[in-house]
């Protein structure tokens, strides 16, 4: 789902969401706005926002041994915005961006790392700015959680206090983001203790999978004490069919200057992409999930009726994987390790 669609979905939902959050304090009366000469306390429980895939800013600092183009920066003294930076998504410059944001998979450790000399950081944990706007310049194309945050602020919440963001490295699956979950747990506990009551978690898209994964690791006593509610916006509980297109032919998320096939190589390196593939435990074994054309091939054969078969053949025909070798030995995104971390209810 593109940024514009996300904003539309949030706008439709925010009125009902905020009424639910505030119903315990308002008793049906209109909510008065706060600020300036009209201060007031928090109107409801603390709120934590967990973004989806591509849903928060990423920054990078470079000290690379080599670059893919002479125009690419090889070394930077400070961190700069990697996502969302529209200036880096234009032709030629996008090659620099892709080389910086990609992940390298280690088939031995089943873990990923950034390219040599690339240091990626996630700005704004505990704040809201990096989830309100994906582009620090606050261009409308990068507006994300802004409408929800601003509505909460108008009703008495304070940015960075009782409404906070929990951004993360969305390129990775949750098993590689353990430090993030420890920080999230600590922030939830801090907010609950300060407010004298539990916290509301609001997640969008893949953020719901991250949230569910996090909650499944917590004992019931912890959840009873610190979590008031978990509000799921657009949760992909059964996986995302669009992921098939992302990996087989690429997806530009509606950005016209980016060719899908150009961005495909980077999208394939993100472990989170494979994590969103339709989950085997959610679909009948005989359900056909794909009937499309693939590259220069004719219509997919009749027996390509499962995700597994699609990717075996896609890898062999499109990626040039030798037919005598297992896919998991050639491409990280077919590794059974990915399926092992799927969240369950």
Positions of predicted regions on the chain:
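N-terminal non-catalytic accessory region
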Residues: 2-202, 206-278, 283-295, 300-305
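C-terminal subdomain of alpha/beta-hydrolase-fold enzymes, centered on the catalytic histidine
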Residues: 301-345
């Amino acid at each position: 789902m593109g940024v514009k669609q996300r904003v539309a979905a949030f706008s439709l939902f925010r009125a009902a969401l905020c009424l639910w959050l505030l119903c315990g304090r308002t008793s049906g009366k209109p909510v008065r706005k706060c600020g300036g000469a009209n201060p007031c306390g928090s109107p409801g429980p603390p709120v934590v926002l967990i973004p989806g895939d591509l849903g928060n800013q990423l920054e990078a600092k470079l000290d690379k041994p080599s670059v893919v183009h002479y125009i690419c920066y090889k070394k930077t003294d400070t961190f700069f915005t990697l996502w969302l930076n529209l200036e880096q998504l234009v032709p030629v410059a996008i090659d620099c961006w892709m080389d910086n944001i990609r992940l390298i998979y280690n088939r031995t450790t089943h873990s990923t790392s950034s390219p040599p000399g690339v240091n990626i950081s996630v700005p704004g944990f505990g704040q809201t700015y990096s989830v309100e706007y994906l582009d620090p310049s606050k261009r409308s194309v990068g507006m994300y959680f802004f409408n929800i945050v601003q509505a909460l602020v108008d009703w008495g919440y304070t940015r960075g206090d009782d409404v906070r963001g929990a951004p993360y490295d969305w390129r990775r699956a949750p098993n590689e983001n353990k430090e993030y979950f420890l920080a999230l747990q600590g922030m939830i506990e801090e907010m609950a203790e300060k407010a004298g009551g539990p916290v509301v978690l609001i997640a969008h898209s893949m953020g719901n999978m991250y949230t569910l994964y996090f909650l499944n690791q917590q004992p019931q006593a912890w959840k009873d004490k610190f979590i008031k509610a978990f509000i799921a916006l657009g949760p992909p509980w059964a996986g995302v069919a669009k992921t098939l297109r992302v990996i087989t032919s690429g997806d530009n998320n509606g950005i016209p200057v980016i060719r899908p096939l150009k961005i495909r190589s980077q999208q394939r390196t993100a472990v989170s992409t494979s994590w969103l593939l339709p989950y085997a435990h959610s679909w009948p074994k005989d359900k056909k999930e794909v009937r499309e054309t693939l590259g220069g091939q004719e219509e997919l054969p009749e027996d390509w009726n499962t995700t597994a078969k699609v990717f075996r053949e896609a890898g062999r025909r499109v990626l040039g994987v030798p037919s005598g070798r297992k896919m998991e030995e050639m491409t990280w995104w077919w590794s059974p390790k990915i399926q092992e971390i799927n969240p369950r209810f």
